[in-house]
Amino acid sequence: MTDTTELQTGITRDIYGMPAFISLEVDDVRAAARWFVEALDFIELFAMPPGDEPVLIHLRRWRYQDILLRQGAAADVGTGVQLSLAATYDELDGLAARARSFDGTVVGGPADTPWNTRDLTVVSPQGLRLVFTARRPEPLRDAAFTADMNRWSQEQLPS
């Protein structure tokens, strides 16, 4: 699992080539941005044009966790599509509580997974499924699964 220490050292306002990002078409860009900022700790990096009626807002949580909200007819996100975001174990309960306080938000978890993570699933009012996933601390990990992963990694990944 990715070491999140470097990624979470403060939200950067750098403009960089994003290796991957998701665009979400929404009917109210400003309202959607407000939800991401207030419910899930994203920042509004910039809006085009600035002001109350932007057609695009660039959101960011940690480095490389970027979302573009674009003005358009609200579209069906699609069955089986989700955005997974690295998180820290200690922040999941707070994110869940904050997200639950917003109408139109569906929250599942946080819950432990068989693969040694703790996941929080949040479905935005726009229908985007976000999964915040954090590595479980050492004493809470399944030792048998860790041993399997180490063995499988040695068998399948070049050294």
Q: Which residue ranges define each predicted feature?
A:
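N-terminal beta-strand motif that seeds the catalytic metal site of vicinal oxygen chelate
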Residues: 1-33, 82-85, 134-159
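Conserved beta-strand in the GNAT
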Residues: 67-70, 131
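Core segments of cupin and vicinal oxygen chelate
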Residues: 14-17, 23-66
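Vicinal oxygen chelate
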Residues: 26-31, 61, 83-129
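Short acidic/glycine-enriched loop/turn segments that link adjacent beta-strands
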Residues: 51-55, 77, 113-118
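Helix-adjacent hinge/juxtasegments
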Residues: 70-89
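A short acidic/small-residue loop/turn micro-motif
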Residues: 75, 114-115, 135-139
